Amino acid sequence: MARVENMTERYAVFGNPIGHSKSPKIHTMFAKETGQSLSYEAILAPIDAFEASFKEFAANEGYGANVTVPFKEQAFSLCDELSEQAQLAGAVNTLSVLADGKIRGDNTDGLGLVADLKRNLGDLCGLQVLLIGAGGAARGSVLPLLHSGIAKLTIVNRTQAKAEALVEIFTSYGDVTSLPITHVGQSYDVIINSTSSSLSGEVPNISPDTIAPHTVCYDMMYGKQSTAFNLWAKSLGAGQTIDGLGMLVGQAAASFSIWRKVTPSVEPVLAQLRSELIG
């Protein structure tokens, strides 16, 4: 579709609900830092009309969008082109409207996770990693984790068949395996909780033996206080606990880089969000 010259390029995040989204603040801060001229808004898409909502946005100078729950799988189906990461994740959180009007989909969730792990831990090479959960958040994280240089990824899930299905998808990309969640006995260097258990104050049913003094525990959830998973990990002597706020900012930075071809700094935005969260 033809573009109108000299207009501020529009970006947005689509979700339902969407009022809680921090994406407009994050991308506005990224734009200011990098000297980019753009607008970024939150769009509440009807549950049964995401495609129509996005296409209307694209037809009105929409250049790109983030996608959050519950539309990531619908966004995947909407795309004319997919990155390898999006293809394997089976979900899209970043849409780009190309010059010829085609829609390209990417998934930056796992990139945000790995970037935050590296920001906190440095080199990930050689680490033994346990991933709890086999839903969309887990699936979007497997390839970036395997590409990060870790020694081995073990996936556990309440329903083991789902964990085994993920292993089948990614087995050719690195050393990845699954275990019954009740059979995990050894300690790990990094344990990642990709489930939403902390939102209800619960902890996945894994053995305390998975945690040693050197273990880093990472919860994709975040809040004003430590998450239930991270509190549990601390009580068992985990060496470090990290919540998912940095992952949120990291995935946004990866999306911004795809659209604008410039990589913004994560730290100032993360510090601002953390200050507001605990303030």
From Swiss-Prot:
Keywords, ordered alphabetically: Amino-acid biosynthesis, Aromatic amino acid biosynthesis, NADP, Oxidoreductase
EC code: 1.1.1.25
Catalytic reaction equation(s): shikimate + NADP(+) = 3-dehydroshikimate + NADPH + H(+)
Catalytic residues (UniProt): K72
Pfam families in alphabetical order: SDH_C (PF18317), Shikimate_DH (PF01488), Shikimate_dh_N (PF08501)
Family affiliation: Belongs to the shikimate dehydrogenase family.
One annotated GO biological process: chorismate biosynthetic process
Residues the entry annotates as binding shikimate: S21, K22, S23, T68, N93, D109, Y222
Recorded GO CC terms: cytosol
Assembly information from the UniProt record: Homodimer.
List of residues binding NADP(+): E84, G133, A134, G135, G136, A137, N157, R158, T159, Q160, A161, K162, M220, G244
Role noted for this protein: Involved in the biosynthesis of the chorismate, which leads to the biosynthesis of aromatic amino acids. Catalyzes the reversible NADPH linked reduction of 3-dehydroshikimate (DHSA) to yield shikimate (SA).
Pathway per the UniProt entry: Metabolic intermediate biosynthesis; chorismate biosynthesis; chorismate from D-erythrose 4-phosphate and phosphoenolpyruvate: step 4/7
Enzyme class, first EC level, given as a word: oxidoreductase
GO molecular function terms attached to this record: NADP binding; shikimate 3-dehydrogenase (NADP+) activity
NCBIfam families listed in its UniProt record: aroE, PRK00258.1-2
PANTHER family: BIFUNCTIONAL 3-DEHYDROQUINATE DEHYDRATASE_SHIKIMATE DEHYDROGENASE, CHLOROPLASTIC, SHIKIMATE DEHYDROGENASE
HAMAP family: Shikimate_DH_AroE
Protein name, entry field: Shikimate dehydrogenase (NADP(+))
